[in-house]
Amino acid sequence: KIQITGLLGDVMKESVQIAVTLVKSRYPEKADLFEKNDLHVHVPAGAVPKDGPSAGITLTTAIASLVTGKAVSPEYAMTGEVSLRGRVMPIGGLPEKLMAAQRAGISRVLIPAENVDDLDEVADEVKEKLKIIPVKTVEEVLKKVLK
């Protein structure tokens, strides 16, 4: 059973479902974990409504970390919608997300490759402080961030 809490909208709930499906398909030898155990996904600040597909890659990475026992490298932040085939798809609000990452002290941010043109809208002082890494697939992301 999958439980989802944190005042999430329908699109974000779908992102959790897609993340679970992707992880099951990428780690078939671990699929029985989902049959034998419940999964509870909570996105903090429970009273604040959250929605949209941008956390898809982050949710997928978190669930892959749980299943594999590999930690996520703390130097990374990431944003991107994911498809059921594992493609990292573009998101909106990239300048604001990169500014927030920089303010939080993050050094590396994974973004959808299809959002590279949006970097023109990002302030130079933000870009100078971040290593911005375009990615196309879930596999690329997991190879970079799971240790």
Where are these regions (language model features)?
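Peripheral, non-AAA+ core regions of ATP-driven protein-machinery
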Residues: 1-147
